[in-house]
C-alpha cells in the first residue's frame, strides 16, 4: 500500500467511531462523507448472515435488480445461437457467440462483467468453467443467468442486476451504488437487496438471520450498521 493511500485511510479512520453502531440513515450519510478518492467510489454493503455455507441448503445465492442501478456500465457476454443470439444482440449484449466466445475466453480475452447462457449452451460453457468460476462469471440458474429469456437477462444486467452469494464465513458483499448517489438512492438499493436476501432465508437457519452489517466505500473504512433496523426495513 502506498504511503499516500495509507495516510488517507488513517485520516478517514479517525472520522469513524470504531465501536459506534449507526442507524441506517446516519450510516449512509456517514459513509458518503468519507468519499475522498479522485474517482467515484463504489458503496458496498457487507452482511454477515446466521447461516453455515458448508450446508447446501444454507448456501445463499441469488440476484436482484437494484432500482437505481449500481452506477457501473456493465458489459455483458451471452452464449447463444440462432434466434436467441439475435435476441441477445438486439437487447444490447456486448458480446454474443458460442464456440468462438469460448475460444476468446480460453485465450484470456475476458472484457465483460457478466455472462449469460441459454440452457443448451451450458455444456460448452462448462468447458471454460475453470476460467469463469474463479472470476465469479459462471452462469447460474439461481441468478437468472442461465435462461431462455436472454433479452430479459441482458436488460436486467444492463439496468443494475447484482449477483450475490455468501462466502465461506457466511458474509455477503454487494455493491449498492456510487458515492455520488444521493442518500435516498443508496437506501432504496440497500432495501431491495435486503428484501431479496430475506426471501432466501433457509428454514434450517437458526437465530438472528442478519448478525452484523456494515457500509464502506472503495477506499474507506467500514461503518457499522444497526442490523436489527436493517431486518425491520420493509
UniProtKB/Swiss-Prot annotation:
<dbReference type="InterPro" id="IPR023673">
    <property type="entry name" value="Ribosomal_uL1_CS"/>
</dbReference>
<keyword id="KW-0810">Translation regulation</keyword>
<comment type="similarity">
    <text>Belongs to the universal ribosomal protein uL1 family.</text>
</comment>
<keyword id="KW-0687">Ribonucleoprotein</keyword>
<dbReference type="GO" id="GO:0003735">
    <property type="term" value="F:structural constituent of ribosome"/>
</dbReference>
<keyword id="KW-0820">tRNA-binding</keyword>
<comment type="function">
    <text>Protein L1 is also a translational repressor protein, it controls the translation of the L11 operon by binding to its mRNA.</text>
</comment>
<comment type="subunit">
    <text>Part of the 50S ribosomal subunit.</text>
</comment>
<comment type="function">
    <text>Binds directly to 23S rRNA. The L1 stalk is quite mobile in the ribosome, and is involved in E site tRNA release.</text>
</comment>
<dbReference type="InterPro" id="IPR016095">
    <property type="entry name" value="Ribosomal_uL1_3-a/b-sand"/>
</dbReference>
<keyword id="KW-0699">rRNA-binding</keyword>
<dbReference type="GO" id="GO:0006417">
    <property type="term" value="P:regulation of translation"/>
</dbReference>
<dbReference type="GO" id="GO:0019843">
    <property type="term" value="F:rRNA binding"/>
</dbReference>
<protein>
    <recommendedName>
        <fullName>Large ribosomal subunit protein uL1</fullName>
    </recommendedName>
</protein>
<dbReference type="InterPro" id="IPR002143">
    <property type="entry name" value="Ribosomal_uL1"/>
</dbReference>
<dbReference type="Pfam" id="PF00687">
    <property type="entry name" value="Ribosomal_L1"/>
</dbReference>
<dbReference type="InterPro" id="IPR023674">
    <property type="entry name" value="Ribosomal_uL1-like"/>
</dbReference>
<dbReference type="InterPro" id="IPR005878">
    <property type="entry name" value="Ribosom_uL1_bac-type"/>
</dbReference>
<keyword id="KW-0694">RNA-binding</keyword>
<dbReference type="GO" id="GO:0006412">
    <property type="term" value="P:translation"/>
</dbReference>
<dbReference type="InterPro" id="IPR028364">
    <property type="entry name" value="Ribosomal_uL1/biogenesis"/>
</dbReference>
<dbReference type="GO" id="GO:0000049">
    <property type="term" value="F:tRNA binding"/>
</dbReference>
<keyword id="KW-0678">Repressor</keyword>
<dbReference type="GO" id="GO:0022625">
    <property type="term" value="C:cytosolic large ribosomal subunit"/>
</dbReference>
<keyword id="KW-0689">Ribosomal protein</keyword>
Amino acid at each position: 500500500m502506498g504511503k499516500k493511500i495509507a495516510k488517507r485511510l488513517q485520516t478517514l479512520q479517525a472520522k469513524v467511531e470504531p465501536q459506534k453502531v449507526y442507524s441506517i440513515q446516519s450510516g449512509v450519510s456517514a459513509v458518503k462523507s468519507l468519499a475522498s478518492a479522485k474517482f467515484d467510489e463504489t458503496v458496498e454493503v457487507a452482511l454477515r448472515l446466521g447461516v453455515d455455507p458448508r450446508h447446501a441448503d444454507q448456501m445463499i445465492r441469488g440476484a436482484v435488480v437494484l432500482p437505481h442501478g449500481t452506477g457501473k456500465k456493465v458489459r455483458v457476454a451471452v452464449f447463444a445461437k440462432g434466434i436467441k443470439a439475435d435476441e441477445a444482440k438486439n437487447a444490447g449484449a456486448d458480446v454474443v457467440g458460442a464456440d468462438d466466445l469460448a475460444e476468446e475466453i480460453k485465450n484470456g480475452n475476458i472484457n465483460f462483467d457478466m455472462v449469460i447462457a441459454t440452457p443448451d449452451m451450458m455444456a460448452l460453457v462448462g468447458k471454460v468453467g475453470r476460467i469463469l468460476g474463479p472470476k465469479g462469471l459462471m452462469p447460474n440458474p439461481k441468478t437468472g443467468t442461465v435462461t431462455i429469456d436472454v433479452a430479459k437477462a441482458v436488460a436486467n444486467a444492463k439496468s443494475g442486476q447484482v449477483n450475490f452469494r455468501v462466502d465461506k464465513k457466511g458474509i455477503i458483499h454487494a455493491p449498492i451504488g456510487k458515492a455520488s448517489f444521493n442518500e435516498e438512492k443508496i437506501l432504496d438499493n440497500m432495501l431491495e437487496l435486503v428484501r431479496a436476501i430475506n426471501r432466501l432465508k433457509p428454514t434450517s437457519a437458526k437465530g438472528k438471520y442478519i448478525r452484523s452489517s456494515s457500509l464502506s466505500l472503495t477506499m474507506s473504512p467500514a461503518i457499522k450498521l444497526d442490523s436489527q433496523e436493517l431486518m425491520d426495513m420493509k
